[in-house]
Curated annotation (Swiss-Prot):
Membership in a protein family: Belongs to the adenosylhomocysteinase family.
Enzymatic reactions: S-adenosyl-L-homocysteine + H2O = L-homocysteine + adenosine
GO MF annotation terms: adenosylhomocysteinase activity
Lineage summary: Bacteria, Pseudomonadati, Pseudomonadota, Alphaproteobacteria, Hyphomicrobiales
Name of the protein described by the UniProt record: Adenosylhomocysteinase
Cofactor comment: Binds 1 NAD(+) per subunit.
Residues noted as binding NAD(+) in the record, renumbered to the chain: 196-198, 230, 259-264, 282, 317, 338-340, 383
Amino acid sequence: MTAKFTDYIVKDIGLAEFGRKEISLAETEMPGLMATREEYGPKQPLKGARIAGSLHMTIQTAVLIETLTALGADVRWVSCNIYSTQDHAAAAIAAAGIPVFAIKGESLEDYWDYTARMFDWHGGGTPNMILDDGGDATMYVHLGLRAENGDTAFLDKPGSDEEVIFFALLKKQLKEKPKGYFAEIAKNIRGVSEETTTGVHRLYDMQKAGTLLWPAINVNDSVTKSKFDNLYGCRESLVDGIRRGTDVMMSGKVAMVAGFGDVGKGSAASLRQAGARVMVSEVDPICALQAAMEGYQVVTMEDAAPIADIFVTATGNKDIITIEHMRAMKDRAIVCNIGHFDNEIQIAHLKNLKWDNIKPQVDEITFPDGKRMILLSEGRLVNLGNATGHPSFVMSASFTNQTLAQIELFANNKDGKYKKEVYVLPKSLDEKVARLHLAKIGVKLTELRKDQADYIGVKVEGPFKADHYRY
């Protein structure tokens, strides 16, 4: 008799059937991943791969996980955000016999405990690959090894409430795990593929400092990720999150978007399409000029604070909305973030104020003067905390890139092809990902003749643009 599978932590395993139905629907909208299964499945390029995955545990991620396993991988999974898990998706993955540790609304203590559990491989041993979103799994190993090697001073100097919890976990691991625990993990990891802007920044910082432990592929800067997921995904999911959280009428409202990168561009478009009058703040003169040329009013946060009804941060930086900005806002202004971390808004400065929870991930905070502010998802990702994130179709492009990156690092890293540096996928694969999604939406591609291809110096089948081309 087969032992019952128990290597998971989910809210309710009874939600698995519901999750499976939604996974089936999502598969129809994710042609890139399904085509990847069909092309690579017989070759099993990930056979022997043990992938530690830290990425929002959504229905779309479930399709990614099952693509990785269809290609031969063994997987353990956690969410990379305490509010982004879809509990029925996690239940479906657990019911399929895949270890997953994720609950929507989990505590930060549980979040880091689950991350640690992800590295304790079933049957012994360690993972040999990481699939990351935001870099927390990568940082867990890097900082754990640093402390294991004797540099522990940083553990007593946390820079945030979350680091207090994270560093306490590392201290616990150093005390309880056998000597050399982190060194063994670090030795076995062949590479990491990173999903998002914030995690990519961390990787480049480590590369610059010479501390990166293994090769990394920057999935975020694949064109079919950043120019689609970051832009078109946010264009659909931002307003979805705000509406589900507040039921507010967007038309006629004044909205302020901090940051006009790809995420900011999508966010501003989302609000404009909903009928809001949109202002933008920027530090980069190029992005500021782009915003102005798109017809947005470019102002500072100080200008916008007393005027706007809705505030959205999309910068990847810290302290974008300060306590002073919040004090200057209108009564019941709506404040949210669509960047990866929660430090774009000074949430810590609000902890001593009066909080009233309206419903999950919606809080009303009252200032001493009686003014109130509506905060969504406690400053974490509003589109995943208050809604269900990006639609399946756009995530198919991102996750096809992730799958190809895992294959590159695990199966194609021959003769030291990938060193301890950060790479991007080649243009040919970027174009392949795009091509896989065309038929689903009825796109008919024009084909170059040989003489036309020769004239512009490309191959008939592509790639069609130089690496330096900006889409």
